[in-house]
């Protein structure tokens, strides 16, 4: 069994298991498989190049399952993108081999390139993707949608980011005006934005500061200016999070339109993996 299952990918391993569990009875299909194995055995160097690409590819079958169930995560879509990016090289290698080997040429012809899908994923998704997309302003998750993909999303993200820059500028300005060198403007989910002053500096607090919360070693305040800006920032952040989720779901839906074709390619890649691994034994 170890010799039979020296595949480079999880999909290849599953296909070996399927072949062994349900032996083929159709003579033409048996002969096709034998021809592929025999032809791969005659080109070990080219075969290793293809198998190396398969080793570094994503588990396309698994991603497709999650895509169809609409539970796919950002990093998995990144895996789909990486696989689509690798398809031209795989098909080119197989096509070069196929000039002398018709069974391999038949495999190469089954490798679709999905140029439209690849373009979408390249334009829409960040290069480094988080495991989860951020679902609310307090939740965990990271950036998924690439800048310049959607103008409205860019506007909201810039507004939220600009607000945070304003907060840093406010902190520096308040330190200078009050003489409180360790004054801080902070944020937490329960209380929003606030100005924090240590107990040792309370005598320097201006009259227009409104007390918000008393801590053991500090007091927290807000100003009308800070409260107004807080609403602007949080509103932009909430809208940006919602927009990013919407755009991500749109990308998922458009990827789903290619699901049947991707499934065919996933099967072809699994066959390439299995037949090339068996060819290496001969």
What are these regions (language model features)?
Residues 1-282:
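Alpha-helical coupling/stalk and coiled-coil linker elements that connect catalytic or binding modules
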